[in-house]
Amino acid sequence: MRSLENIFVQYDEKGKNIDVFNTIKNKNKNISDSFKILNNSDEYKPAKLLISEIMPHYMDIDGNFVEQFQTTGFDARIWELYLYCYFNEEKFIINKDYSAPDFYISKDGYNISIEASTLNNKKEYQLDIKIDDRINSILPIRFGSSIKSKIDHVDKNNLHYWEYEHTKDKPFIIAIADFSNDISMIYSSNSLINYLYGYSHEISYNKEGNLNIIPKKIENFKYNDKVVDAGFFLKKENENISAILSSTSGTLNKFLRIGKQSGFDKYNKLCIMKEAFYYDPNPNASKPIHDISEVTEKTNEKWGDGLSIYHNPNAKFPIQRHLFPNATHHFFRNGLIETVTHPYSLLSSITYISIR
């Protein structure tokens, strides 16, 4: 069983408890289905108990966390809460003196600002669209749109996120998560990496059985009447974005699994199975390692499992990799994407829940 101190590092004393589960009474706001499941179902009780333990340490700068968490912004707030836990796991000091960007973190003399963003559900996902079209067209366009909205944003003084007094001349990261479909995180990382670097990669094996990786340049992404250029990081105008951070597992199920392994299923009423795909360290491997296991109090999943940082090769203020040791890091060199990760690091996962 992991102690709470190992789940998130506590740099300050508990503040005023934010009761996110006391349902708001607002006739103009509909309570989200996701919140209802978390708040009322036995299956998600470990997640609910874990979040209740975390919230006294979380500072609601905007003052609207509870309302958004329960209504239209559930996924976005789960993503922010996940990031909070991850940055604590990496032993960053989180400075909440500023309302924007979403996070201002410090470690080893480095200061970094982060703005969070999500891809939300759209009507197009109710249509019968082929998975290849989603990966190769729709999702890159949607990632591009979400990232562009953060780049174009200015405050009342016409300043961008990286131009504030406390953020200028420091690295700036956009942390983006795909909530556009229940399982889209499993495959959307390919869409993101293709959009950012403008290359896809084909694989083949030579006669000796050695793996060959062939880069293939992508000019743009098209879907219906929308066209978006590929290679976001290759444009000098985007040099202020030091990196893009994303995770294939920054969801409610992450809180469920860590809640389970932390002892919040006291009587072991839930059977939680995790189907996962892991990085294969074999240099000739072209497919991930597949595994199915039960989540127990002996499990040791980290917040950083499944998290990737995509580094901008043209960043004005690059990110130092050693500050994020639990993340998988992606770099672009000579038309190839170089990935630095731990052996058997998590690529993606699916969670199955049943009551014993």
Task: Explain the meaning of each model-derived region.
Residues 120-291, 295-304:
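Metal-dependent nuclease catalytic core centered on acidic motifs
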Residues 84-106:
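A short acidic/basic microdomain associated with nuclease active sites
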Residues 263-356:
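Charge-dense, extended regions
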Residues 72, 111-115, 173:
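Short hydrophobic-acidic sequence motifs that mark active-site Asp/Glu residues
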Residues 69-77, 164-169:
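Short, charged/polar micro-motifs that form catalytic or ligand-binding hotspots
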Residues 7-74:
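Interdomain/boundary linker segments immediately adjacent to catalytic/signaling cores
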Residues 87, 103-105, 112-120:
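Conserved catalytic cores of phosphodiester-cleaving nucleases, focusing on short active-site segments
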Residues 76-84:
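TRNA-binding/sensing appendages of the translation machinery
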